[in-house]
Amino acid sequence: MPSLRIEQHESHRYPPRTWVNAQSADLTVAIAVDFTTKGELLTKRAAGAAFVALPLEGDPLDAARLLWKAVRQRDARTLNIAGNGICTMAKHGWSQERINTWVYQVIGKVHQHHPISFIRSGGQTGADIAGLVAAYALGIECLGLYPKRFLQRTIDNLDVRRSAEEIEAEIKSWAAGLV
């Protein structure tokens, strides 16, 4: 199985790890139902030109085509998967399992034609963790870089502390459900 690393940033705040993740990948992939949230605007600013937005409501095959064009244009082999958290996505009818499946289908299709060597994310619920789930299920090395103490925002918009072991077990369980 691929390497799955769960690490924490030195800051308790979300923005510092957003900047590190965006600047450490060839391309940042924002997966969202609302691209106007503070987090999405920060992610786009941090990624600069190395950014592609994939609307979650779209067909996974159409999203894969859009992502494939972006990775080919930049010859991107490392991705930062970002996007809305589950608290935003749930308001639009999305469960974490459904997001995981959608992201897995998109990345899996691109990976067949343009191999991805590494995926990183901020590990938040919703799109971020779905990127790690997809990477692990597809055999792609991956890293979740969380705020200090592995903060995650819940469906109720509350920040909770997790352990690296809890997060790793959750990712592996969801990935097993995809393959």
Could you say what each language-model-derived stretch is?
Residues 1-121, 126-179:
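Acidic/glycine-enriched connector segments
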